[in-house]
Amino acid sequence: RDSNVTILPLRNMKD
């Protein structure tokens, strides 16, 4: 679950 929360912000930066 913690991994998912870290990917959320990462994906926003990529967009």
UniProtKB/Swiss-Prot annotation:
Keywords recorded for this protein, A-Z: Aspartyl protease, Glycoprotein, Hydrolase, Protease
Source organism of this protein record: Ovis aries (Sheep)
GO MF terms held by the record: aspartic-type endopeptidase activity
Family per record: Belongs to the peptidase A1 family.
Name of this protein: Pregnancy-associated glycoprotein 66e
UniProt lineage: Eukaryota, Metazoa, Chordata, Craniata, Vertebrata
Keyword check for Protease: yes
Glycan-bearing residues: N4
EC top class named in words: hydrolase
Tissue distribution: Highly expressed in the placenta between day 60 and day 100 of gestation.
Any Gene Ontology biological process: proteolysis
Highest taxon of source: Eukaryota
EC number: 3.4.23.-
